[in-house]
Amino acid sequence: MKKLLSLPPNLVECFHDVEKVERSEWFCTSDPVGSKLGSGGGTAWLLDACRKEWSPEASLHEWLPREKRILLHAGGQSRRLPGYAPSGKVLTPVPVFRWARGQRLSQNLLSLQLPLYEQIMEKAPDSLHILIASGDV
């Protein structure tokens, strides 16, 4: 299942190294510099950028139903947590909860969100191909 992330511009090139994830499974881009696309425009931008990089020969209509994808909007201004705006909200560290299983000291918001999103998509009907989520919820 592919993961598509909209990130702050400075994080796009280094995200795979920081999180130690495969480029073939994770696509990252940012909104055009100086533009405020909003969630709808950002979703369209992210999907089209991913299609152009991974399957430039296919139309968007052909490409969308090929596989399931999790799309996370993780950029933005982060007005509530400005200290995490440069690194992206999904990389915000989350403290370990006492007595909780499966937690690790290096956990961040993304590592806590992703298992649920993957479970949702695995149980979703085959006709549903994209889960769109906000990276800070």
Task: Kindly give the residue locations of the regions a language model identified.
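Unchanged
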Residues: 1-137
